[in-house]
Amino acid sequence: MMSRIEAYQSDIAVLMDPETVLLPDFISALSYAHELGRDWLLVSSSVEIPRFPFHWDETRHFWRQDNGKRVRFRELQKMISLRSLQSNSSASKMIMAWNNIDMPLHCGVLPPFLYQRGTHNQWIINEAMSCKRRFVFDATSTISSFFLGNAENIYNRSDNVSEPKTRNWEYVGNSHLGQLYGSLYSRSYTLPKLLKCNRRYIFVSASERSTDLSIPKGKSLGFRTREKISACITRTKSRSLKLDFVQKDETVPPLKFPFDLESLLPLVADKNRTVVLSVAGYSYKDMLMSWVCRLRRLKVPNFLVCALDDETYQFSILQGLPVFFDPYAPKNISFNDCHFGSKCFQRVTKVKSRTVLKILKLGYNVLLSDVDVYWFRNPLPLLQSFGPSVLAAQSDEYNTTAPINRPRRLNSGFYFARSDSPTIAAMEKVVKHAATSGLSEQPSFYDTLCGEGGAYRLGDDRCVEPETNLTVQFLDRELFPNGAYGDLWLKEDVRAECEKKHCFVLHNNWISGRLKKLERQMMKGLWEYDASMRMCV
């Protein structure tokens, strides 16, 4: 978020939540700050209003009461001021504004915080104070802003997302990042306040015992004016920035938190009880994050990560991911040699089918996607349209003229499975077959669901498993191409070629070795993550 702001050409930058409503005094305060003659950072908390009692008139220029009477600006200010005394302002709905955006806000390295998941705003303010390059002040008493109470509980207006307060792992991750970077957990402070009294902007020191009026040089104030200003300061001192600063002796939550698969599923799943699952080890952590960043950009929040090792588990928490650890995952996973066909690959892939089966039995549909599958569009609406008793899977067939359901051409790195009796029974057979096989799970999928040698094939794009009556639908390769189909990865502009075909995804497979896979995806511009900054790009 901060990087995006710095990319703009502007005299003043403002970072705020889109649900926040600003009144005209915000512009007045900015104009005053702009004339300070030094670099500054303005911060202000917004007030929560459970129900806004006014409505727009037909011109959409004025608010009016139910009786049609126009609401004046001072009435709105009074309502906000009274409400601020009755409820806490929201740190997540804070407004931050600063000048000279070419100069950094602080001297530290910004952690990969998830915006609006706690700690971020406190960290920015603390580091700006520590850096001492800017004058940091609290303008809460001067700026009138509010948000509706229900807006605080909305993560996204899509029905496919859950409320942020349930996504506790994101707050825990931010808290730990705040401890690892900077000095937030080693100091506390209060900010000087900007007030407007007797039509004058003045700064009041943070000390409760004295008021330091910042009056321009060469000007003096009469006794009556000073009396009015003192009374104004007394009235407004209660309105100030409200942040949950961590005290020096306060301990942060443990990095391991009580979320297992069963507890994460209802928090992450969309309204159709569907989750997107990926399984990853530490060697693929950067590719995992590129995959996550892409899903976030596509506004697909209902994903889960199964960590194969403790390093991936902790890394995922710090990145704000909904992650669970598989205690039965194979140990000693090779860092560079866990590619297709290797013994390591064979052991790792069997974790995926076991996990999918467990999720299906818990009553949730699963889209299993390897992290090397690049998403151009959200495929869930299409995949869910296949209906019950259908497992939709990518085809690994590269020959453009051959049937896409040829033997051993079912790709177990991208498929959609419903939580219904035929699918669960068929997946149990796949897991049982893979457990006794010396190969990866991929041959077990085909031999079980399509029969050895393709005995259960139906036409050129389907199979029907006779005992469970499950239909396997091989996905159109124009929309779901594998890594060898149409030589797409050899095109100069892979993205343009895929978008021309209206691809949903492109699998980065049919290439051996982790480093080659990473290089190809980065060089072709299908990479969404900056590993040096641990942030999405």
Swiss-Prot record:
Q: Which UniProt keywords apply?
A: Cell wall biogenesis/degradation, Glycosyltransferase, Transferase
Q: Which InterPro entries match?
A: Nucl-diP-sugar_transferase, RAY1-like
* Motif annotated as DXD motif, chain positions: 370-372
One Pfam family, please name it. Answer: Nucleotid_trans
State a single Gene Ontology molecular function: glycosyltransferase activity
Gene Ontology CC terms: Golgi apparatus
Deleted gene: phenotype: Reduced growth of primary root. Delayed flowering.
Keyword Transferase in record: yes
Q: What is its EC number?
A: 2.4.2.-
Question: GO BP, one example?
Answer: cell wall biogenesis
User: Which pairs of Cys residues are joined through disulfide bonds in the record?
Assistant: none
Report the domain of life of the source organism. Answer: Eukaryota
Q: Is Transferase set as a keyword in this record?
A: yes
Give the family from UniProt. Belongs to the glycosyltransferase 77 family.
Read off the domain note.
Answer: The conserved DXD motif is involved in enzyme activity.
What role is this protein assigned? Beta-arabinofuranosyltransferase that transfers specifically an arabinosyl residue from UDP-arabinofuranose to the monosaccharide galactose or beta-methyl-galactoside in vitro. Catalyzes the addition of a beta-arabinofuranose residue onto a beta-galactosyl residue of an Yariv-precipitable wall polymer in vivo.
> Could you tell me what this protein is called?
Beta-arabinofuranosyltransferase RAY1
